Amino acid sequence: MIKLAGNFLITTVIESLGEAFAFGHKFGVDPHTFLDILTNSLFTAPIYRNYGSMIASDKFEPAGFKLPLGLKDNRLLLAAAEEAAVPMPMASLVHDRFVVALAQGLGEADWSAIARTSYQNAGLRKEVTE
């Protein structure tokens, strides 16, 4: 359960980064500048630097942890949470992000590719660029 909870936390960071980058992009902020400011001030942990760099560069291959594996862990987490009657709305949101990314052909990509859906939802990218 701890591994699932840890992976859940990572996916929520990825989701949050995707939304934040899309927000910044809408206001004309260069993604690399955005990343530099974030990771040199409030968010200095490696997880923000590493996943933020992938999102800023829109490069999700080679995958460190493939998207289908993230979906698998997310499903296991949601099943365990349901069994224990623990609502996890963020996990449900992330689940949908995984499904969308897989539907767009990102099965070989790093699980951080779910961040692309935030860009697409903001009208910034209409198609997957590989």
Give the role of each language-model region.
Residues 128-130:
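ATP-dependent carboxylate/acyl-activation modules
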